């Protein structure tokens, strides 16, 4: 029987998962077992082309096996598509840093990170940075973080402010653009610019995720065939209403998941 074990096609005479596990690890107990994206301790009958992953806890695998292990919990056949995608994340604050990390964990092959700012203490309440990153450019800090999570992702950085003059050259090679700015003017400039210069290019933007209002008011809406908007559309940051990690993270999750759906050619919200 032909199966896929840790990303490699093999022939086996084993009929069940337990038989296969014993063949490779005898009676070791520190083995994580994943079948077609699902972790299980149960015995399972093997069948042709089933995908099985064994991970020995505490042991660093070879580079060839490591990439497969990173995506072992993915839904089957997702990784082949996402690793070919190139996504731009414009703005690396509370939304953008969380979105970029999510996409890196998902296995997106190329991430294009754009921001001109540096990490400062007030960023740490909602952004994916650490004390050790203070004073670093956000592009550099986030690239370093991603390298520790998914070393197979190519990370391209541009330490610039997006303007009408550079927008077309910045985003011409990206499959999908993610708007993650924190000011209305920047949001409008990017969304309108992508729609104008790149007909057919998908853009996922945000509006309304400040404060600590209900999580359930944050939605993903399809505005046009190529423009998606995440948030509640109302709760912008202002005096007396700040940006908090939980709701910012929820909105970032909406954006990252919509980007994943678009990569997988799922166009409905």
Regions found by a protein language model. Name each.
Residues 1-10:
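Eukaryote-biased recognition of intrinsically disordered, low-complexity regulatory segments
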Residues 75-118:
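Glycine-rich adenosine-cofactor-binding loop
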Residues 6-7, 30-46:
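Short acidic beta-strand-loop surface patches of small beta-rich interaction domains
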Residues 113-150:
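Glycine-rich phosphate-binding loop and adjoining beta1-alpha1-beta2 segment
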Residues 139-174, 181-184:
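A structured beta-alpha segment of the ubiquitous adenosine-cofactor-binding alpha/beta core
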Residues 42, 53-87:
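N-terminal charged helix/coil linker that caps or initiates catalytic domains
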Residues 13-27:
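Short amphipathic, charge-patterned alpha-helical segments
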């Amino acid at each position: 029987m032909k199966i896929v074990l840790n990303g490699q096609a093999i022939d086996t005479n084993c009929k069940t998962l337990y038989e296969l596990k014993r063949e490779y690890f005898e009676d070791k107990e520190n083995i994580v077992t994943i079948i077609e994206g699902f972790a299980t301790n149960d015995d399972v009958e093997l069948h042709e082309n089933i995908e099985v992953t064994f991970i020995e806890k505490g042991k660093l695998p070879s580079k060839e096996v490591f990439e497969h292990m990173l995506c072992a919990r993915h839904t089957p056949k997702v990784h082949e598509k996402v690793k070919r995608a190139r996504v731009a994340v414009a703005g690396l604050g509370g939304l953008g840093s969380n979105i970029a990390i999510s996409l890196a964990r998902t296995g997106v092959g190329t991430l294009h990170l754009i921001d001109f700012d540096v990490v400062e203490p007030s960023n740490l309440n909602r952004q994916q940075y650490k004390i050790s990153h203070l004073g670093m450019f956000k592009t550099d800090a986030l690239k370093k973080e991603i390298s520790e999570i998914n070393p197979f992702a190519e990370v391209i950085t541009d330490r610039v402010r997006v303007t009408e003059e550079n927008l077309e050259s910045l985003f011409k090679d990206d499959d999908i653009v993610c708007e993650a700015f924190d000011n209305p003017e920047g949001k409008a400039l990017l969304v309108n610019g992508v729609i104008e210069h790149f007909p057919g290019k998908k853009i996922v933007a945000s509006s309304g995720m400040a404060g600590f209002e209900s999580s359930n008011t944050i939605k993903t809406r399809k505005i046009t065939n190529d423009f998606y908007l995440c948030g509640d559309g109302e709760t912008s940051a202002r005096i007396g209403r700040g940006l908090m990690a939980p709701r910012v993270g929820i909105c970032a999750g909406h954006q990252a998941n919509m980007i994943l759906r678009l990569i997988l050619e799922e166009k409905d919200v």
